[in-house]
Curated annotation (Swiss-Prot):
Region (Alpha N-terminal domain (alpha-NTD)), start-end ranges: 1-233
Main EC class the enzyme belongs to: transferase
Protein name: DNA-directed RNA polymerase subunit alpha
Entry's family note: Belongs to the RNA polymerase alpha chain family.
Naturally occurring in which organism (per UniProt): Wigglesworthia glossinidia brevipalpis
GO process terms (BP): DNA-templated transcription
Protein backbone atom coordinates (compact mmCIF):
# COMPACT_ATOMS: atom_id res chain seq x y z
CA UNK A 1 0.00 0.00 0.00
CA UNK A 2 1.33 3.41 -0.91
CA UNK A 3 1.57 6.01 1.83
CA UNK A 4 1.44 9.04 -0.42
CA UNK A 5 -0.94 11.63 1.05
CA UNK A 6 -2.04 12.62 -2.46
CA UNK A 7 -2.83 9.12 -3.77
CA UNK A 8 -6.50 8.13 -3.76
CA UNK A 9 -7.68 4.63 -3.04
CA UNK A 10 -9.64 3.02 -5.86
CA UNK A 11 -12.88 1.43 -4.66
CA UNK A 12 -14.04 -2.00 -5.75
CA UNK A 13 -17.51 -3.51 -5.97
CA UNK A 14 -17.41 -5.69 -2.89
CA UNK A 15 -20.81 -7.32 -2.84
CA UNK A 16 -24.21 -7.40 -4.53
CA UNK A 17 -26.78 -8.86 -2.16
CA UNK A 18 -29.77 -9.90 -4.26
CA UNK A 19 -32.76 -9.72 -1.90
CA UNK A 20 -35.20 -10.38 -4.73
CA UNK A 21 -35.29 -10.05 -8.50
CA UNK A 22 -35.98 -6.33 -8.20
CA UNK A 23 -34.41 -5.55 -4.81
CA UNK A 24 -30.69 -5.51 -4.02
CA UNK A 25 -28.01 -4.04 -1.78
CA UNK A 26 -24.77 -2.98 -3.45
CA UNK A 27 -21.62 -2.38 -1.40
CA UNK A 28 -18.65 -0.35 -2.61
CA UNK A 29 -15.40 0.11 -0.66
CA UNK A 30 -12.88 1.43 0.24
CA UNK A 31 -13.56 5.09 -0.42
CA UNK A 32 -11.64 8.09 0.81
CA UNK A 33 -13.37 9.94 3.63
CA UNK A 34 -16.30 11.98 2.32
CA UNK A 35 -16.47 10.17 -1.01
CA UNK A 36 -19.19 7.85 0.26
CA UNK A 37 -21.67 10.73 0.44
CA UNK A 38 -20.27 12.37 -2.73
CA UNK A 39 -20.78 9.27 -4.88
CA UNK A 40 -23.86 8.02 -3.05
CA UNK A 41 -25.78 11.26 -3.52
CA UNK A 42 -24.71 11.63 -7.18
CA UNK A 43 -25.71 8.06 -8.07
CA UNK A 44 -28.99 8.34 -6.17
CA UNK A 45 -29.98 11.51 -8.05
CA UNK A 46 -29.10 9.95 -11.42
CA UNK A 47 -31.00 6.76 -10.63
CA UNK A 48 -34.11 8.71 -9.64
CA UNK A 49 -34.15 11.36 -12.36
CA UNK A 50 -32.04 10.32 -15.34
CA UNK A 51 -32.62 6.63 -16.00
CA UNK A 52 -34.53 5.85 -19.21
CA UNK A 53 -37.72 3.85 -18.95
CA UNK A 54 -41.28 3.43 -20.20
CA UNK A 55 -44.53 4.97 -19.00
CA UNK A 56 -48.19 5.22 -19.96
CA UNK A 57 -48.76 8.75 -21.27
CA UNK A 58 -52.28 8.65 -22.78
CA UNK A 59 -55.42 6.57 -22.25
CA UNK A 60 -58.79 6.42 -24.00
CA UNK A 61 -61.65 4.61 -22.26
CA UNK A 62 -64.87 4.05 -24.16
CA UNK A 63 -67.69 6.15 -22.71
CA UNK A 64 -65.38 8.38 -20.66
CA UNK A 65 -64.82 12.06 -21.53
CA UNK A 66 -62.73 13.16 -18.54
CA UNK A 67 -60.92 11.66 -15.57
CA UNK A 68 -63.34 13.02 -12.94
CA UNK A 69 -66.02 10.49 -13.72
CA UNK A 70 -66.91 6.87 -13.15
CA UNK A 71 -67.97 3.97 -15.34
CA UNK A 72 -70.98 1.82 -14.65
CA UNK A 73 -70.07 -1.71 -13.68
CA UNK A 74 -66.50 -0.77 -12.68
CA UNK A 75 -65.64 -0.70 -9.00
CA UNK A 76 -62.90 1.95 -9.28
CA UNK A 77 -63.44 5.49 -10.49
CA UNK A 78 -61.44 6.75 -13.46
CA UNK A 79 -58.80 8.50 -11.35
CA UNK A 80 -58.03 5.18 -9.59
CA UNK A 81 -57.77 3.38 -12.93
CA UNK A 82 -55.34 6.00 -14.22
CA UNK A 83 -53.21 5.65 -11.08
CA UNK A 84 -53.11 1.88 -11.61
CA UNK A 85 -52.09 2.38 -15.24
CA UNK A 86 -49.25 4.67 -14.13
CA UNK A 87 -47.84 1.74 -12.16
CA UNK A 88 -47.62 -0.52 -15.22
CA UNK A 89 -44.10 -1.87 -15.67
CA UNK A 90 -43.38 -2.78 -19.27
CA UNK A 91 -40.69 -2.73 -21.93
CA UNK A 92 -41.04 -1.81 -25.61
CA UNK A 93 -38.50 -3.53 -27.85
CA UNK A 94 -37.15 -1.83 -30.96
CA UNK A 95 -39.23 1.36 -30.79
CA UNK A 96 -40.04 4.28 -28.51
CA UNK A 97 -43.86 4.35 -28.75
CA UNK A 98 -46.51 1.65 -28.66
CA UNK A 99 -50.31 1.79 -28.61
CA UNK A 100 -51.87 -1.11 -26.72
CA UNK A 101 -55.49 -2.14 -26.30
CA UNK A 102 -57.52 -3.84 -23.58
CA UNK A 103 -61.02 -5.29 -23.62
CA UNK A 104 -62.59 -7.23 -20.78
CA UNK A 105 -66.19 -8.09 -19.89
CA UNK A 106 -67.94 -9.95 -17.11
CA UNK A 107 -67.34 -10.03 -13.38
CA UNK A 108 -63.72 -10.17 -12.28
CA UNK A 109 -60.37 -8.48 -12.10
CA UNK A 110 -58.88 -6.65 -15.05
CA UNK A 111 -55.11 -7.15 -14.94
CA UNK A 112 -52.10 -6.22 -17.03
CA UNK A 113 -52.23 -9.69 -18.60
CA UNK A 114 -55.47 -8.64 -20.33
CA UNK A 115 -53.60 -6.02 -22.37
CA UNK A 116 -53.42 -6.98 -26.05
CA UNK A 117 -49.97 -6.42 -27.54
CA UNK A 118 -47.53 -7.80 -30.05
CA UNK A 119 -44.24 -9.55 -29.34
CA UNK A 120 -42.40 -6.22 -29.07
CA UNK A 121 -43.95 -5.45 -25.68
CA UNK A 122 -43.03 -7.21 -22.46
CA UNK A 123 -45.25 -6.75 -19.40
CA UNK A 124 -43.17 -7.34 -16.27
CA UNK A 125 -46.02 -7.81 -13.77
CA UNK A 126 -48.97 -9.35 -15.63
CA UNK A 127 -50.83 -9.87 -12.33
CA UNK A 128 -50.99 -6.10 -11.70
CA UNK A 129 -54.66 -5.15 -11.16
CA UNK A 130 -56.02 -2.24 -13.20
CA UNK A 131 -59.66 -2.37 -12.08
CA UNK A 132 -62.52 -4.69 -11.09
CA UNK A 133 -65.71 -5.36 -13.04
CA UNK A 134 -68.75 -5.87 -10.80
CA UNK A 135 -71.59 -7.00 -13.12
CA UNK A 136 -72.04 -9.77 -15.65
CA UNK A 137 -72.87 -7.30 -18.40
CA UNK A 138 -70.16 -4.75 -17.48
CA UNK A 139 -67.17 -4.24 -19.75
CA UNK A 140 -64.23 -1.93 -20.30
CA UNK A 141 -62.43 -1.05 -23.51
CA UNK A 142 -59.18 0.96 -23.41
CA UNK A 143 -56.46 2.17 -25.74
CA UNK A 144 -53.18 2.77 -23.94
CA UNK A 145 -50.25 4.75 -25.32
CA UNK A 146 -46.82 3.90 -23.91
CA UNK A 147 -43.69 5.96 -24.56
CA UNK A 148 -40.01 5.75 -23.78
CA UNK A 149 -38.40 8.66 -21.93
CA UNK A 150 -36.55 9.66 -18.80
CA UNK A 151 -37.27 11.66 -15.71
CA UNK A 152 -40.70 13.02 -14.88
CA UNK A 153 -42.87 14.75 -17.49
CA UNK A 154 -46.15 16.28 -16.22
CA UNK A 155 -49.26 15.91 -18.34
CA UNK A 156 -49.74 19.69 -18.41
CA UNK A 157 -46.66 20.00 -20.64
CA UNK A 158 -48.60 18.12 -23.37
CA UNK A 159 -51.92 19.95 -22.97
CA UNK A 160 -51.11 22.24 -25.91
CA UNK A 161 -51.56 19.46 -28.49
CA UNK A 162 -54.29 20.89 -30.72
CA UNK A 163 -55.47 17.67 -32.38
CA UNK A 164 -56.06 15.84 -29.08
CA UNK A 165 -59.58 14.43 -29.30
CA UNK A 166 -62.09 14.73 -26.46
CA UNK A 167 -61.80 11.73 -24.17
CA UNK A 168 -58.07 11.20 -24.58
CA UNK A 169 -56.76 11.40 -21.03
CA UNK A 170 -53.19 12.52 -20.40
CA UNK A 171 -51.12 11.07 -17.57
CA UNK A 172 -48.10 12.41 -15.74
CA UNK A 173 -45.25 10.23 -16.98
CA UNK A 174 -42.70 8.92 -14.50
CA UNK A 175 -40.22 7.08 -16.71
CA UNK A 176 -37.72 6.11 -14.03
CA UNK A 177 -37.61 2.34 -13.46
CA UNK A 178 -36.35 2.95 -9.90
CA UNK A 179 -39.10 2.73 -7.29
CA UNK A 180 -37.04 3.20 -4.15
CA UNK A 181 -33.40 3.98 -3.47
CA UNK A 182 -31.38 4.91 -0.42
CA UNK A 183 -27.74 4.85 0.55
CA UNK A 184 -25.80 4.55 3.76
CA UNK A 185 -22.17 5.33 4.53
CA UNK A 186 -20.31 3.23 7.09
CA UNK A 187 -16.74 3.22 8.34
CA UNK A 188 -14.24 1.06 6.46
CA UNK A 189 -10.68 -0.03 7.18
CA UNK A 190 -7.72 -0.89 4.98
CA UNK A 191 -4.59 -2.03 6.82
CA UNK A 192 -3.78 0.76 9.27
CA UNK A 193 -6.19 3.29 7.82
CA UNK A 194 -9.50 3.56 9.64
CA UNK A 195 -10.75 6.88 8.23
CA UNK A 196 -12.32 5.39 5.10
CA UNK A 197 -15.90 5.06 3.82
CA UNK A 198 -18.02 2.10 2.80
CA UNK A 199 -20.97 2.96 0.53
CA UNK A 200 -24.07 0.75 0.70
CA UNK A 201 -26.78 1.44 -1.89
CA UNK A 202 -30.16 -0.24 -1.52
CA UNK A 203 -32.64 -0.04 -4.37
CA UNK A 204 -35.84 -1.51 -5.74
CA UNK A 205 -36.79 -1.37 -9.41
CA UNK A 206 -40.11 -1.91 -11.15
CA UNK A 207 -38.78 -5.03 -12.87
CA UNK A 208 -37.90 -3.49 -16.23
CA UNK A 209 -34.24 -3.45 -15.18
CA UNK A 210 -32.37 -5.35 -12.49
CA UNK A 211 -30.57 -3.37 -9.73
CA UNK A 212 -27.07 -4.35 -10.85
CA UNK A 213 -27.67 -3.15 -14.42
CA UNK A 214 -29.25 0.04 -13.07
CA UNK A 215 -26.25 0.97 -10.92
CA UNK A 216 -23.87 0.25 -13.80
CA UNK A 217 -25.89 2.43 -16.16
CA UNK A 218 -26.04 5.25 -13.61
CA UNK A 219 -22.27 5.06 -13.12
CA UNK A 220 -21.79 5.18 -16.90
CA UNK A 221 -24.00 8.29 -17.16
CA UNK A 222 -22.01 10.00 -14.39
CA UNK A 223 -18.69 9.04 -16.00
CA UNK A 224 -19.76 10.33 -19.43
CA UNK A 225 -20.87 13.65 -17.94
CA UNK A 226 -17.49 14.09 -16.25
CA UNK A 227 -15.51 13.34 -19.42
CA UNK A 228 -15.84 16.97 -20.47
CA UNK A 229 -13.83 18.02 -17.42
CA UNK A 230 -11.23 15.31 -18.05
CA UNK A 231 -10.82 16.56 -21.63
CA UNK A 232 -10.12 20.12 -20.46
CA UNK A 233 -6.42 19.35 -20.51
CA UNK A 234 -6.61 18.61 -24.24
CA UNK A 235 -8.29 21.88 -25.12
CA UNK A 236 -5.88 24.39 -26.51
CA UNK A 237 -6.92 27.98 -26.29
CA UNK A 238 -6.56 29.65 -29.66
CA UNK A 239 -3.56 31.87 -29.75
CA UNK A 240 -4.59 35.46 -30.05
CA UNK A 241 -2.01 37.24 -32.07
CA UNK A 242 -1.61 40.75 -30.88
CA UNK A 243 -1.44 43.11 -33.75
CA UNK A 244 1.74 45.04 -33.34
CA UNK A 245 1.58 48.64 -34.48
CA UNK A 246 3.33 49.23 -37.78
CA UNK A 247 5.42 51.99 -36.19
CA UNK A 248 6.75 52.59 -32.72
CA UNK A 249 4.33 55.12 -31.17
CA UNK A 250 7.33 57.26 -30.16
CA UNK A 251 8.14 57.84 -33.83
CA UNK A 252 4.67 59.29 -34.39
CA UNK A 253 5.06 61.96 -31.74
CA UNK A 254 5.99 65.55 -32.75
CA UNK A 255 9.58 66.73 -32.27
CA UNK A 256 8.23 69.29 -29.78
CA UNK A 257 7.90 66.40 -27.33
CA UNK A 258 11.70 66.15 -27.28
CA UNK A 259 11.78 69.53 -25.51
CA UNK A 260 14.78 70.78 -27.49
CA UNK A 261 16.07 74.31 -27.22
CA UNK A 262 14.21 76.89 -29.27
CA UNK A 263 17.15 77.21 -31.66
CA UNK A 264 17.33 73.47 -32.39
CA UNK A 265 13.55 73.13 -32.68
CA UNK A 266 13.29 76.01 -35.15
CA UNK A 267 16.09 74.57 -37.29
CA UNK A 268 14.30 71.23 -37.54
CA UNK A 269 10.97 72.80 -38.44
CA UNK A 270 12.67 74.84 -41.14
CA UNK A 271 13.75 71.52 -42.69
CA UNK A 272 10.16 70.16 -42.46
CA UNK A 273 11.15 67.77 -39.69
CA UNK A 274 7.88 67.63 -37.73
CA UNK A 275 7.89 64.12 -36.24
CA UNK A 276 10.48 62.12 -34.34
CA UNK A 277 10.24 59.54 -37.14
CA UNK A 278 11.35 62.25 -39.59
CA UNK A 279 14.28 63.17 -37.37
CA UNK A 280 15.80 59.74 -36.68
CA UNK A 281 16.08 59.02 -40.42
CA UNK A 282 18.43 61.98 -40.87
CA UNK A 283 22.16 61.41 -40.54
CA UNK A 284 24.57 63.64 -38.62
CA UNK A 285 26.01 64.93 -41.90
CA UNK A 286 22.54 65.87 -43.17
CA UNK A 287 21.67 67.72 -39.98
CA UNK A 288 24.95 69.66 -39.93
CA UNK A 289 24.04 71.01 -43.37
CA UNK A 290 20.92 72.54 -41.83
CA UNK A 291 21.30 76.37 -41.56
CA UNK A 292 22.01 77.62 -38.00
CA UNK A 293 22.29 74.05 -36.60
CA UNK A 294 25.79 73.50 -35.24
CA UNK A 295 27.59 70.74 -33.39
CA UNK A 296 26.20 71.87 -30.04
CA UNK A 297 22.62 71.49 -31.29
CA UNK A 298 23.55 68.16 -32.92
CA UNK A 299 24.90 66.85 -29.61
CA UNK A 300 21.74 67.98 -27.85
CA UNK A 301 19.56 66.13 -30.38
CA UNK A 302 21.62 62.92 -30.09
CA UNK A 303 21.48 62.99 -26.28
CA UNK A 304 17.72 63.48 -26.22
CA UNK A 305 17.18 60.65 -28.72
CA UNK A 306 19.39 58.27 -26.75
CA UNK A 307 17.13 58.67 -23.70
CA UNK A 308 14.39 57.13 -25.85
CA UNK A 309 16.63 54.37 -27.23
CA UNK A 310 16.73 56.10 -30.60
CA UNK A 311 19.63 57.22 -32.81
CA UNK A 312 20.17 59.21 -35.95
CA UNK A 313 20.50 57.40 -39.27
CA UNK A 314 17.77 54.83 -38.55
CA UNK A 315 15.91 53.20 -41.45
CA UNK A 316 12.13 53.07 -41.12
CA UNK A 317 10.23 51.19 -43.81
CA UNK A 318 6.98 52.61 -45.21
CA UNK A 319 7.56 55.99 -43.61
CA UNK A 320 5.64 58.27 -43.39
CA UNK A 321 2.44 56.47 -42.31
CA UNK A 322 -0.89 57.24 -43.97
CA UNK A 323 -2.23 58.90 -40.81
CA UNK A 324 0.54 61.52 -40.91
CA UNK A 325 0.02 62.17 -44.60
CA UNK A 326 -3.70 62.76 -44.00
CA UNK A 327 -2.99 65.13 -41.13
CA UNK A 328 -0.52 67.03 -43.25
Amino acid sequence: MHNSATEFLKPRLVDIEQISKTHAKITLEPLERGFGHTLGNALRRILLSSMPGYAVTEVEIDGILHEYSSKEGVQEDIVEILLNLKELALIIKGKDIAVLSLFKSGIGKVTASDIIHDGNVEICHPEHVLCNLTHENSSINMRIKVQKGRGYVPAISRMHIEDRPIGRLLLDACYSPIERISYNVEAARVEQRTDLDKLIIEMETNGTIDPESAIRRAATILSEQLEAFIDLRDIRKPEIKEEKPEFDPVLLRPVDDLELTVRSANCLKAESIHYIGDLVQRTEVELLKTPNLGKKSLTEIKDVLSTRNLTLGMRIENWPPVSILKND
